[in-house]
Amino acid sequence: MWRTNQVSSRQNMAGFTLIEVLVAIAIFASLSVGAYQVLNQVQRSNEISAERTARLAELQRAMVIMDADFRQMALRQFRTDGEAPSEQILQWKESLLDSDQHGLLFVRLGWHNPQQQFPRGEVAKVGYRLFENRLERVWWRYPDTPAGQQGLISPLLTGVEDWAVQFYLQGEWSKEWVPTNALPEAVKVTLRLKDYGEIERIYLTGGGSLNMTQESVENAG
């Protein structure tokens, strides 16, 4: 009787079998892999969300800056590299500003300089170009610049495959800008982005025309 109880006690104290251990390990491994995949997906989703938020902020910032520039277009000639005043107060030309495509150049108002605290005027020369798939803003502290003075370059938007500008005047849109003494009533900017495709924005300007003779006299003075 005593031996039978001893054998039964030993059997009750026996541990897990090898198969049970392997099954437990397999289940634990499966749960670990599943948990890792879920965690990885959540982390990747957060990264994608952050990237898209940053991209939208970049796009919105570029649009706001362009809106401010176009709304403040000035009826004023400008000088580049110390040369005579430009014939056009708004230039839209191939390779202008070393652009990979067309470049845009004009003068803008509204750059406040209270009590002349900063080494610049309140009227600035501003340009836009497409360079290595980036939309860049090129600007100068003054509208009339001496020879050799380079503009300051501010990257606005990355991933730009193509860009185009159209000009609205007297009820018609034009892909070229011919008038020498006038500004368009509106500017349409079309951008083709790698991620968002083609987007289009229309910006109003002050419009108007300039007496070139009077402007030339004022610039000469």
From Swiss-Prot:
The organism's place on the tree of life at top rank: Bacteria
GO CC field: plasma membrane; type II protein secretion system complex
Statement: the UniProt record of this protein carries the keyword Ubl conjugation: no
Maturation propeptide residues: 1-15
GO annotation, biological process: protein secretion by the type II secretion system
Function according to Swiss-Prot or TrEMBL: Component of the type II secretion system required for the energy-dependent secretion of extracellular factors such as proteases and toxins from the periplasm. Part of the pseudopilus tip complex that is critical for the recognition and binding of secretion substrates.
Protein's name in the database: Type II secretion system protein J
Gene name of this polypeptide: epsJ
